[in-house]
């Protein structure tokens, strides 16, 4: 036991060293840039003039940018108030700029993979006849995210991540052709060891196994040579966007997706990563609430493509052709459930905020109720307006947030959004047993979504994410029932935030809110 504790501590220390070293190196680059601006006194006039012109150009560019004001306003204020520092920081971290080569790489991969998905226009037409209230969202996803809607798919809902893990292990052990796993965080401890054992057995049985994880998300959980260890076991392994001590504009864009695909027949997604705390093996923040879903049937194709997009785009050189036919084989399956299932993915490399648009659309389409659960509540003006407008229309809008935070500064920002929502009729509940990490929404007993997308700027604008929109199916009622249970375990904070706040608190929260888009 002591040896395991020591190994875990060592991994955390190694990850911390990597993170601190990289952060210091990047900070030094930023400091050096500011230093060069300020110390060249003999060129002060020219530097000030150049900085002023550049600041004006950047502000005008930001003002005319096709982006929410919540994202651009903090930069405009920072650049105008402190031109040298503001311009320097914006050029370093504010351009939302994955390098052109990276964008081109993803566009090239998408051009090869997305056409492999069926259009399913007939299903969309059928959906319009049966559930017109949800059809607009599915049409949006099909035409803008390029992920179609499906039928003939069974969905199983897991109200606890541990239940999802057990089902996942069972399905993994039965894999015959391939296993794809993509996660934001993997922790090299008991929960992962159970998965690794099954994956190793499947490799020995001739199954192709691929594992893909985000370096930043896993940096405190695994050793740097984790991918090499997997390769030695016969598991193909890749790391997304490795943390490096050199400045990289793409560093802020992380892979937050959570996908498992088995033989192209079964897929899993949800809020949980592959680490002990998600399964309540450890309890750093009280009870951990997470959820997941299992798909079996036609809709699995979309998650297969979503995985292959990230896998192939992460190669240094994109192959001229990507043959996915062996992973999209047709097989006879007759679903026991009815309904419409639509997996989708979101990318920060385009100007389409798929995750936010789905949430806003659900609030706009809701007629009776629209409920959300999220670990963080740091939203744009557009999202806030959609929620409050729905409440003003008489829709029962509720949001569940954690009772115990995992990041106290971010929790303070989350709470700073309460007042503007509750005074317009949105009800907010804090889940008192611990930390809720689930990311879901359900509306009117008709539609729901479950996936990886938090109600915060990072998920909605900066990360690669995924979700699954579901309409007119049994799982919607199961998700609704879980929400009802959660409300009974939560403390409503609405009344407290309807009353006035102290001037000090208002000032502090205003500052946090102003720069929330930069978090």
Stretch-by-stretch model annotation:
Residues 373-374, 401, 431, 450-451:
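Thr-Gly-centered strand-to-loop micro-motif
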Residues 439:
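Catalytic-core elements of nucleic-acid end-processing and repair enzymes
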Residues 333-338, 346, 353-375, 381-392, ...:
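Acidic, glycine-rich loop-and-beta core segments that form the ion-binding/anion-interacting portion
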Residues 1-357, 361, 405, 419-423, ...:
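N-terminal localization/anchoring segments of enzymes in phospholipid and broader phosphate metabolism
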Residues 421, 428-429:
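A C-terminal junction/extension of Radical SAM enzymes
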Residues 184, 375-376, 410:
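Glycine- and other small-residue-rich loops at beta-strand/loop junctions that grip anionic moieties
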Residues 382-385, 389-391, 396-423:
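Extended hydrophobic/aromatic segments used for targeting, binding, or gating
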């Amino acid at each position: 036991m002591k040896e395991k504790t020591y190994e875990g501590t060592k991994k955390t220390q190694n990850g911390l060293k990597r993170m601190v070293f990289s952060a210091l190196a990047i900070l030094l680059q930023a400091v050096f840039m500011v230093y060069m601006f300020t110390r060249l006194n003999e060129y002060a006039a020219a530097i000030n003039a150049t900085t002023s012109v550049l600041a004006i150009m950047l502000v005008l560019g930001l003002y005319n940018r096709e982006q929410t004001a919540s994202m651009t306003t903090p930069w405009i204020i920072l650049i105008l108030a402190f031109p040298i520092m503001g311009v320097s920081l914006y050029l370093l971290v504010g351009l939302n700029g994955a390098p052109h080569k990276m964008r081109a790489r993803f566009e090239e991969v998408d051009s090869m993979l997305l056409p492999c998905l069926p259009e399913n226009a007939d299903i969309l037409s059928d959906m319009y006849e049966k559930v017109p209230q949800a059809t607009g969202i599915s049409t949006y996803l099909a035409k803008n995210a390029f992920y179609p809607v499906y039928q003939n798919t069974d969905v199983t809902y897991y109200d606890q991540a541990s239940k999802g893990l057990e089902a996942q292990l069972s399905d993994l052990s039965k894999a015959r052709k391939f296993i794809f796993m993509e996660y934001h965080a993997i922790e090299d401890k008991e929960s992962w060891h159970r998965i690794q054992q099954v994956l190793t057995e499947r490799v020995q049985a001739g199954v192709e196994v691929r594992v893909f994880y985000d370096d930043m998300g896993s940096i405190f959980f695994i050793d740097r040579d984790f991918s090499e260890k997997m390769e030695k076991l016969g598991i193909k392994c890749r790391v997304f966007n490795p943390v490096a001590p050199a400045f990289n504009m793409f560093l802020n864009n992380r892979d937050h997706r959570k996908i498992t695909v088995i033989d192209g027949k079964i897929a899993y997604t949800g809020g949980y990563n592959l680490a002990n705390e998600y399964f309540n093996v450890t309890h750093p923040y009280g009870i951990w609430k997470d959820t997941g879903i299992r798909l079996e049937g036609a809709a699995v194709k979309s998650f297969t493509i979503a995985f292959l997009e990230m896998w192939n785009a992460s190669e240094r050189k994109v192959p001229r052709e990507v043959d996915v036919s062996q992973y999209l084989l047709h097989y006879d399956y007759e679903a026991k459930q009815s309904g419409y299932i639509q997996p989708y993915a979101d990318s920060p490399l385009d100007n389409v905020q798929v995750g936010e648009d789905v949430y806003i659309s659900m609030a706009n389409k809701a007629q009776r109720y629209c409920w959300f659960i999220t670990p963080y509540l740091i939203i744009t003006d557009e999202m806030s307006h959609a929620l409050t407008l729905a409440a003003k229309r008489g829709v029962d809008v509720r949001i569940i947030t954690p009772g115990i935070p995992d990041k106290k500064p971010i929790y303070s920002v989350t709470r700073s959004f309460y007042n503007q929502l509750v005074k317009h009729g949105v009800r907010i509940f804090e889940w008192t047993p611990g930390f809720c990490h689930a990311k879901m929404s359900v509306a009117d007993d008709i539609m729901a979504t479950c996936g990886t997308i938090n109600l915060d700027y990072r998920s909605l604008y900066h990360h690669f994410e995924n979700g699954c929109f579901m309409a007119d199916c049994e799982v919607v009622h199961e998700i609704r029932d879980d929400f009802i249970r959660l409300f009974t375990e939560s403390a409503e904070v609405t009344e407290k935030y309807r009353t006035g706040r102290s001037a000090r608190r208002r000032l502090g929260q205003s500052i946090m809110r102003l720069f929330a888009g930069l978090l």
